[in-house]
Amino acid sequence: MNSKIEIKPGRLTLAELRRMAKAPVGVRLEEKCKGKINASVQTVGEVIRQGRVIYGINTGFGLLANTIIPNEELEHLQRSLILSHAAGVGAFMADSTVRLMMVLKINSLARGYSGIRLEVIEALVQLLNAEVYPSVPQKGSVGASGDLAPLAHMSIVLLGEGEASYRGQRLSGREGLELAGLSPITLGPKEGLALLNGTQASTAFALQGLFAAEELFATAMVSGSLSLDAALGSRRPFNPLIHAVRGHKSQIDVAASYRQLLEHSEIERSHKFCEAVQDPYSLRCQPQVMGACLNQIRNAAEVIGTEANAVSDNPLVFCKENDIISGGNFHAEPIAMVADNLALAIAEIGALPERRTALLIDSHMSGLPPFLVDKGGLNSGFMIAQVTAAALASENKSLAHPASVDSLPTSANQEDHVSMATFAARRLLEMADNTAGILAIELLAACQGIDFRAPLKTSPLLEEAKSIVRQVVAFYDQDRYLAPDIKNAQALVQAGAFNHLVSRDLLPSFNR
């Protein structure tokens, strides 16, 4: 496990969250947050002693909020809440998703507005540091009142119930606790609700979608530049004068990055004074399209970063005011909307490379051998690889349909508008996988095209990119089993093998 990250409640950075998403990282709580945590517990105790009726502390839940629960049943109320709400279905989330969800929940609870004891938060920290991850089904949340079912499955392990995993091994919840050196916890008033209310599952998926979108974006900048050179496209549309007069910062930044990637290309110099006037849009309009995508990524990073540090519990404990107030911070509409926008960006990041691959295999458009292989007819080359890219791009168009407008009332109409944020964010991972496949195919096609331009070379940065590809996939001199080549190139995309070739200032979590 890597060195520990100190959780300063409400101040987790995207760079820290990226680290946690990629590999197990130990955490510890900042010492000075503990006083506020303890004070919130004292406030809950004082409210109970005063005999005040507060939702979720001494009442039922949802439509049953008007049912008053006697003090001697308050512990049972919290246990029952978690058991009944652990009702998710489907395949379990990846450990990386659960790891993020746990970190986000710890971060939120540690801000001291939830009335949950320090020992419960520390138990989550201990589970996380032991790499014992609750087994959480992917489906069952509508993103309001928070991610109830996923967080119940996360929390049920603290009771010694449910299931967990440890380095690929499936365990019972009790076995997971023992492995982490813990015993089952008896929850106090409000603690079950504090664990369950929140947007941490939706936000964990959204973070993973954001990080994947950034890596796809970086790769698409590289693969698009390779395709431009392979097709003898012009750099003139990337001239800063063009982008300055439009004024969109992300477009300006993207155009600058393209210029940097293409600088000192021998191929480009060889046709600098050719008669071609305008390239097809998939080459010429890359700064405009990718700039718009970058704008969505940057906006999503801002919103998701805020939500990752938010208190999304209900009700909230305000110690200074000696008050506990019911509200709606559990409603994940901000995540749902930015996830929808990220879906559009991921689809568009994949749409351009599919079109460029189609251009490269068309000898009339690219001037390269048909389907990028010698002895066409005997060899089919990249013919069906482009069909695969088209299939993936089309699938992404369907997956990009907005989820945030698709509300359904729940809990006997008490919860009559919900966000659907969990699905909105979860489908980003499938879309990102599709786009990684499209980019893998473009990388192979573009590198093939560059090799056909030998002895001329592309730019130094793009030669480095081609070298990365050629380390795992050889030149395609005749037809061979192509699926493993695509898989190997896709693994490069998903590992962020090309991230270092674009400016670290371009993408949000690369530089925070």
Curated annotation (Swiss-Prot):
Domain of life: Bacteria
Crosslink position(s): 5-imidazolinone (Ala-Gly): 144-146
One GO biological process term: L-histidine catabolic process to glutamate and formamide
Molecular function per GO: histidine ammonia-lyase activity
Reactions catalysed, as given in the entry: L-histidine = trans-urocanate + NH4(+)
PTM annotation: Contains an active site 4-methylidene-imidazol-5-one (MIO), which is formed autocatalytically by cyclization and dehydration of residues Ala-Ser-Gly.
EC number: 4.3.1.3
Class of this enzyme: lyase
First-listed, main subcellular location of the protein, grouped into a coarse class: cytoplasm
SUPFAM superfamilies per record: L-aspartase-like
Key words of the record: Cytoplasm, Histidine metabolism, Lyase
GO cellular component: a single term: cytoplasm
Localization (cell): Cytoplasm
Pfam annotation, one family: Lyase_aromatic
Residue positions, PTM 2,3-didehydroalanine (Ser): 145
UniProt-listed PANTHER family: HISTIDINE AMMONIA-LYASE (PTHR10362)
Recorded family membership: Belongs to the PAL/histidase family.
Protein name in the entry: Histidine ammonia-lyase
Organism encoding this protein: Desulfotalea psychrophila (strain LSv54 / DSM 12343)
High-level lineage: Bacteria, Pseudomonadati, Thermodesulfobacteriota, Desulfobulbia, Desulfobulbales
